[in-house]
Structures are given as C-alpha cells and as structure tokens.
Amino acid sequence: MDHNARFVAQTVVAFVMILPIFAQPSPRSHALDEDGALALLEQTLKHDGVYAHRISLNCVTYGTEETTGAYFQFVLRENHNAKCGGDPETSPVVDRYRVYRKSGKIEWLERVEDNWQPYNPAKIR
C-alpha cells in the first residue's frame, strides 16, 4: 500500500472512531410518532450493544407505558417462553426509556436513584 493510500485509510479509520463522540441526536424536521420512536430506541440499543452481555434482544419485549406531547415512555421486559427460558407467568422489567418526539433524545430511568438520566450506554450495561 503506498503512502497516500495508507494515509487515507488511517484518516477514515480515525474519523469513524471519533464520530460517535461528537454525534448527538439531530433536531428533527418533524416529530417522531410512536413507531418511529420505538424503532429509534431499538436501533440505538442494538447498535450500542447495551444488553449484549445481559440478555438477547430476541428475548425482550417493548411496551408503551406513557405518551405525552413531548415523549414516549417505553418499558423493556424479559420475554419468558420456551426459547428464552424463565417463568412464562412473569415478565420482569429490564429498563425504562423515554424517547423525545422532536429531538429524538433518549433518556433512561436510573432505578436506584429513581430519576431520568441522559442515555449513556456505559451506565446501562
């Protein structure tokens, strides 16, 4: 690989590595509906691997707990069935999230302090 190609490859790799540090949810031209908010949440959790070492995302279900003019609040629950295991009569809460309609900002309910925190995958894992 010649010097210029190596430099370009290193620059691209460096850009890809630091982009998530500066990436913030962009203001949306239109507000999210419930399906869009849930899709954003699922995509974000999957991309960040928040539950990769805790539970398969195939073994969770999402439910809408609250809808306001500002946000949708979702609950993430364990899915107990033959494939995922567990008592099928229960579906314990894993976490709760709010997705804001206009900004796409995500918040997570920190259960010990019982307050809403900005989404930070490192704190949730």
What are the language-model segments listed below?
Residues 2-12:
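Bacterial N-terminal signal peptides that target proteins for export
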Residues 45-50, 67-68, 72, 76, ...:
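Eukaryotic scaffold repeat domains enriched in small/polar residues
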Residues 105-125:
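C-terminal partner/receptor-binding element of secreted or periplasmic proteins
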Residues 49-50, 82-86, 107-108:
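Short, solvent-exposed loop/turn elements at domain surfaces
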Residues 26-61:
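Short, non-transmembrane alpha-helical segments in secretory-pathway proteins
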Residues 10-20:
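Bacterial N-terminal signal peptides
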